[in-house]
């Protein structure tokens, strides 16, 4: 089977830099797609699977340890951004609030941002963090694509049922929204996710 063009492009992704605040980010130009997810949603694993790189995004035994915005460059005009994870981080409330403020600044003011990929554990969908990101997407009219991660943990029928339930709950979402099943373990949904990333980043899928 021929390699998906986005798989090939993403495999070339290189770590560019980390930033805590908006003014530390790379120049605000080109196109960026950001990846968000609460702790334990499988965000780093999803990024590593989609890029075909085992350790591009750091995975940690302690969820919530990634406290910075991490930028990965595909080329001069295109980047992926790994946003901080939330949920189980063993830090003070004031520190969590500080992270939240920096994330809000990035999401609301970053002109290069063209889409948000939200990782949502299919066994625990629509938690507070997910709802917060959906609300921000609605307010900013920012396209959002949801990966229902860890789909391999459920039988296909149960996974599909959960997907349809979440889809029904979000049908009134005012911003462009799409969702799919995904598994970093067995590769379920990679083609669909690559298609969406290619659309947002302006990389067309070449027909054979």
Curated annotation (Swiss-Prot):
Give the molecular function GO annotations.
Answer: GTP binding; metal ion binding
- Where does this protein hold Mg(2+)? 44, 66
GO biological process annotation, one example: division septum assembly
Disulfide bond in keyword set: no
Cofactor(s) the protein requires to work: Mg(2+)
Q: Which residues bind GTP?
A: 37-44, 64-68, 82-85, 149-152, 182-184
Asked if the Swiss-Prot or TrEMBL record annotates the protein with the keyword Cell membrane, the reply is no
Question: One GO term of the cellular component aspect?
Answer: cytosol
Q: Which domain of life is it from?
A: Bacteria
Instruction: Please report the stretch or stretches of sequence annotated as the EngB-type G domain.
Output: 29-203
Tell me the InterPro entries matching this sequence: G_ENGB_dom, GTP-bd, GTP-bd_ribosome_bio_YsxC, P-loop_NTPase
Kindly name one Pfam family recorded for this protein: MMR_HSR1
Record keywords, A-Z: Cell cycle, Cell division, GTP-binding, Magnesium, Metal-binding, Nucleotide-binding, Septation
Its family? Answer: Belongs to the TRAFAC class TrmE-Era-EngA-EngB-Septin-like GTPase superfamily. EngB GTPase family.
Its job: Necessary for normal cell division and for the maintenance of normal septation.
| Name of this chain's protein | Probable GTP-binding protein EngB
Species source reads: Alcanivorax borkumensis (strain ATCC 700651 / DSM 11573 / NCIMB 13689 / SK2)
Per the UniProt record, the lineage of the source organism begins with: Bacteria, Pseudomonadati, Pseudomonadota, Gammaproteobacteria, Oceanospirillales
């Amino acid at each position: 089977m021929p390699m998906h063009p986005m798989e090939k492009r993403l495999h070339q992704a290189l770590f560019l830099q980390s930033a805590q605040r908006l003014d530390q980010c790379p120049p605000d130009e080109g196109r960026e797609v950001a990846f968000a997810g609460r702790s334990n949603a499988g965000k780093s694993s999803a990024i590593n699977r989609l890029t075909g790189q085992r350790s591009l995004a750091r995975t940690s035994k302690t969820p919530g340890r990634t406290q910075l915005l991490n930028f990965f460059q595909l080329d001069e005009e295109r980047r992926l951004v790994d946003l901080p994870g939330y949920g189980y981080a063993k830090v003070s409330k004031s520190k969590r609030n500080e992270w939240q403020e920096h994330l809000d600044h990035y999401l609301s003011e970053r002109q290069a941002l063209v889409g948000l990929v939200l990782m949502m554990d299919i066994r625990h969908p629509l938690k507070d963090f997910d709802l917060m990101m959906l609300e921000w997407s609605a307010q900013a009219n920012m396209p959002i694509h949801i990966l229902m991660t860890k789909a391999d943990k459920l039988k296909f029928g149960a996974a599909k049922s959960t997907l349809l339930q979440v889809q029904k709950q979000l049908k009134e979402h005012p911003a462009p929204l799409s969702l799919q099943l995904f598994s970093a373990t067995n590769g379920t949904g990679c083609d669909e996710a690559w298609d969406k990333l290619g659309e947002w980043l302006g990389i067309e899928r070449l027909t054979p």
